[in-house]
């Protein structure tokens, strides 16, 4: 099993996977995976198709339960929590397959996420306020709309706020998903193949955008991405999965030259 040396930078992580395993019948999709992620880090997760990357994301965000192992977030075991509970703790994600509300406008997509965040404290009172049109509810609606528009401006979609999500170009839909995730005001942002379908220029802009978002929101970012040059140039550290197992972990220069990685993944890149 790949392990990290205990150093000052890894002794108090914001997130720690400890022996995470996920079985589907006789198939082991994620096999005893352990790693730590530090606050404000951009942490990459790479590997061939079928390596278990998205399954690991699904376990980490509560969409599917781990068969064994634990996920520790800010010294709390969140392994048994449901997705909405994990989101309320401060972990948000995007998906490999875009999951927007296509019939709704861009600003409405972001506003929905803001509602989830702002009303998590007392949903019953918030519901009653909305039903009866109380001033507090009206003020919240205005604040939600204003924040949603600010986030769209941040991701470069301010001029398309009123367009239906389904009519946006693919790259803009990706940015809208990120804006929606940011609306939850997360501490950790998980991005599942954010550069999928983008041309080289768009990928370069995405890298710069992720750095800017990390800085502006004081985020920790964990991303899955198939475009190896993007990951190598963007991430502080990288973990490599192969057939569900962690085969390498470290800074980009170390991972790039790891023989196991070259054989399993990087050697297949054109």
Ranges and model annotations:
Residues 2-270:
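Glycine-rich phosphate-binding loops of nucleotide-dependent enzymes
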């Amino acid at each position: 099993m790949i392990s990290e040396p205990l150093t000052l930078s890894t002794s108090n992580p914001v997130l720690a996977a400890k022996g995470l395993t996920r079985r589907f019948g006789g198939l082991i999709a994620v096999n005893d995976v352990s790693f730590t992620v530090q606050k404000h880090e951009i942490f990459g997760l790479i590997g061939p198709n079928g390596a278990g990357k998205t399954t690991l994301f699904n376990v980490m965000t509560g969409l599917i339960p781990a068969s064994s192992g634990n996920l520790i977030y800010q010294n709390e075991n969140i392994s048994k929590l449901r997705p909405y509970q994990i989101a309320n703790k401060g972990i948000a994600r995007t998906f490999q397959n875009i999951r927007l509300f296509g019939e709704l406008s861009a600003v409405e997509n972001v506003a929905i996420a803001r509602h989830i965040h702002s009303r998590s404290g007392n949903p019953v009172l918030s519901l009653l306020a909305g039903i009866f049109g109380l001033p507090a509810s009206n003020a919240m609606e205005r604040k939600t709309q204003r924040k949603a528009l600010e986030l769209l401006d941040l991701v470069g979609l301010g001029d398309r706020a009123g367009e239906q999500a389904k009519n946006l170009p693919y790259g803009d839909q990706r940015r809208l998903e990120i804006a929606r995730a940011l609306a939850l005001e997360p501490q950790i942002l998980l991005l599942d193949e954010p550069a999928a379908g983008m041309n080289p220029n768009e990928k370069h802009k995405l890298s710069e955008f992720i750095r800017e978002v990390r800085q502006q929101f004081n985020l920790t970012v964990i991303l899955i991405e198939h475009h190896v040059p993007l990951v190598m140039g963007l991430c502080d550290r990288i973990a490599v999965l192969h057939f569900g197992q962690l085969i390498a972990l470290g800074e980009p220069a170390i991972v790039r030259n790891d023989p196991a990685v070259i054989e399993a993944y990087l050697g297949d890149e054109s």
